[in-house]
Amino acid sequence: WIMGHMVNAVKQIPTFLNDGANAIEADITFKGAVPTYSYHGTPCDFGRVCIRWEYFDVFLQTLRDYTTPGNSKYYEKFILFVLDLKTGSLNNNEVRKAGENVAKGLLKNYWNNGNNGGRAYVVLSLPDIAHYEFIRTFKEVLKAEGHENLLDKVGYDLSGPYLPSLPSLDSVHEAFKKAGVDGHVWLSDGLTNWAPLGDMARLKEIVKRRDSENGFISKVYYWFVDKYSTTRTALDVGVDGIMTNFPYVIIDVLNESGYKDKYRLATYDDNPWETFKK
């Protein structure tokens, strides 16, 4: 999975897809518990415009257009999107309400209330393992609305907080248990593109846990990868996905002699909740 990073304005969507992405990531900002904009703000990655945005509902409707067969904007290879949910400032009650609002927003504006909506898979990424109630409420709303089947298309990523230090993987696992999640787990690690590349120790730990006999992680992705050398290193570690500002870089590496026989671009038929066994 090649995930175009910080795709927050609708006009950016075809640009990233044409550059080689088969997935995108957008930043969802809230007013209270209400998801309002796809917007990142400053600071952001080097070389990017930080302030592009769209209204949340319009953004989801546009994603639906690009992922609904028969629509004039349909891209067959666009198979997944990540919603980076900026819930960091919300209290517990707001987190639960935010889960309800995001569920209703996706149901109405992306899934078209279950009537020929978008077909892409969705990963809900939350910045704090304490926000597991978001996931519980999200799931409850879809069940109550009679669309529990749509949960087959939804995965989850609990990734922080980053300060004072990242939670242990055991703590992350416990948060998923509290959320009622068993499977459909994506986990990530990474650095902004202006930071020096570290030793990827946590990434290696996540991959090892994914591949363990009792691993709770379905897929692992790394961000933000803009260099050819970093792409090769991440692939050598064994990631399933890469988030990038330059999808064509990842495509180029996938076509290199050392990688084209080991990796390929994911398609819609590849299950994003199934751990690949070598």
UniProtKB/Swiss-Prot annotation:
Cofactor remark: Binds 1 Mg(2+) ion per subunit.
Catalytic EC class: lyase
Secretion signal, residue range per the UniProt entry: none
Enzyme Commission no: 4.6.1.-
Known catalytic reactions: an N-(acyl)-sphingosylphosphocholine = an N-(acyl)-sphingosyl-1,3-cyclic phosphate + choline; an N-(acyl)-sphingosylphosphoethanolamine = an N-(acyl)-sphingosyl-1,3-cyclic phosphate + ethanolamine; a 1-acyl-sn-glycero-3-phosphocholine = a 1-acyl-sn-glycero-2,3-cyclic phosphate + choline; a 1-acyl-sn-glycero-3-phosphoethanolamine = a 1-acyl-sn-glycero-2,3-cyclic phosphate + ethanolamine
Residues that, per the record, bind Mg(2+): E25, D27, D84
GO molecular function terms noted in the UniProt entry: lyase activity; metal ion binding; phosphoric diester hydrolase activity; toxin activity
Gene Ontology biological-process annotations: killing of cells of another organism; lipid catabolic process
Highest taxon, organism lineage: Eukaryota
Disulfide bonds: C44-C50
Cofactors: Mg(2+)
Tissue: Expressed by the venom gland.
Function as written in the Swiss-Prot or TrEMBL entry: Dermonecrotic toxins cleave the phosphodiester linkage between the phosphate and headgroup of certain phospholipids (sphingolipid and lysolipid substrates), forming an alcohol (often choline) and a cyclic phosphate. This toxin acts on sphingomyelin (SM). It may also act on ceramide phosphoethanolamine (CPE), lysophosphatidylcholine (LPC) and lysophosphatidylethanolamine (LPE), but not on lysophosphatidylserine (LPS), and lysophosphatidylglycerol (LPG). It acts by transphosphatidylation, releasing exclusively cyclic phosphate products as second products.
Similarity remark: Belongs to the arthropod phospholipase D family. Class I subfamily.
Record protein name field: Dermonecrotic toxin LlSicTox-alphaIII3iii
Provenance organism: Loxosceles laeta (South American recluse spider)
Lineage: Eukaryota, Metazoa, Ecdysozoa, Arthropoda, Chelicerata
